[in-house]
Amino acid sequence: MAENGASQETTQVAKHQEVGHKSLLQSDALYQYILETSVYPREPEPMKELREITAKHPWNLMTTSADEGQFLNMLLKLINAKNTMEIGVYTGYSLLATALALPDDGKILAMDINRENYEIGLPVIQKAGVAHKIDFREGPALPVLDLMVEDKSNHGTYDFIFVDADKDNYINYHKRIIELVKVGGVIGYDNTLWNGSVVAPPDAPLRKYVRYYRDFVLELNKALAADPRIEICMLPVGDGITLCRRVS
């Protein structure tokens, strides 16, 4: 019986990893319990609608998980964020979680290279009455950030910055946005456990995109741990999120 149980558990883990769940929990049942007990019953209707729309999109694994969306929404309220930035938007699930958490005069500078994906969620965002908080910019974020850093009046003006974009540029983003977030403000980097691949052996059967970006994620994690300007906390929420509180 023990052997059979172990075999079933191994199969479950293999299936979990194969479908690329937006959770690092090795038990699908436990993750489902979290969703059904804590997340879905309290999920705002606009977020539920956008989550269900996004689930039909072929790139839906790019979206922020529902539990991470809930976490971001509460975090923003706890820190009383008002001026925020998001790098990497996709259909806007995390953007909507942010917009719903901000006061009516709150602002989000949102950047993504694909406006078409953003427009999938835009009708939901508009219906939720929070579109006026969002300044969406289509195109690469680095040129925009460079211009912002050049203007000293932008330094230390952001309460919260969320990065969920091209992992090979995370270090480049950090070099710039650390100047833009205020002392006491927070930066959130998504996917910092990267499908659990950060601890995978060299011969692990990783998907090509997971293997390609793995070293960039490891580089970021090492850099954040050594950066004296921030306090950090890495959490196994979604695909891993690292919160950085600027202290100097």
Swiss-Prot record:
A divalent metal cation binds at residues 164, 190-191. It catalyses: (E)-caffeoyl-CoA + S-adenosyl-L-methionine = (E)-feruloyl-CoA + S-adenosyl-L-homocysteine + H(+); (E)-5-hydroxyferuloyl-CoA + S-adenosyl-L-methionine = (E)-sinapoyl-CoA + S-adenosyl-L-homocysteine + H(+). GO terms for molecular function: caffeoyl-CoA O-methyltransferase activity; metal ion binding. GO terms for cellular component: cytosol. It is an enzyme of class 2 (transferase). Its cofactor is a divalent metal cation. Induction: Circadian-regulation with peak levels occurring at the end of the light period in flowers. Its EC number is 2.1.1.104, 2.1.1.-. It is found in: Cytoplasm, Cytosol. CDD domains: AdoMet_MTases (cd02440). Keywords: Cytoplasm, Lignin biosynthesis, Metal-binding, Methyltransferase, S-adenosyl-L-methionine, Transferase. It holds the Pfam family Methyltransf_3. GO terms for biological process: circadian rhythm; lignin biosynthetic process; methylation; phenylpropanoid metabolic process. Substrate binds at residues 22, 164, 195. Its main location: cytoplasm. Mostly expressed in petal limbs and tubes, and, at low levels, in stems, roots and leaves. Coiled coil: none annotated. S-adenosyl-L-methionine binds at residues 64, 86, 88-89, 94, 112, 141, 166. Gene3D superfamilies: Vaccinia Virus protein VP39. Binds 1 divalent metal cation per subunit. The keyword Chloroplast does not apply. Pathway: Aromatic compound metabolism; phenylpropanoid biosynthesis. PANTHER family: CAFFEOYL-COA O-METHYLTRANSFERASE 1, O-METHYLTRANSFERASE-RELATED. Involved in the production of floral volatile phenylpropanoids in flowers of fragrant cultivars (e.g. cv. Mitchell and cv. V26) from cinnamic acid, a common precursor with the anthocyanin biosynthesis pathway involved in flower pigmentation. Methylates caffeoyl-CoA to feruloyl-CoA, also able to methylate 5-hydroxyferuloyl-CoA. Belongs to the class I-like SAM-binding methyltransferase superfamily. Cation-dependent O-methyltransferase family. CCoAMT subfamily. This is Caffeoyl-CoA O-methyltransferase 3. It comes from Petunia hybrida. The lineage of its organism: Eukaryota, Viridiplantae, Streptophyta, Embryophyta, Tracheophyta.
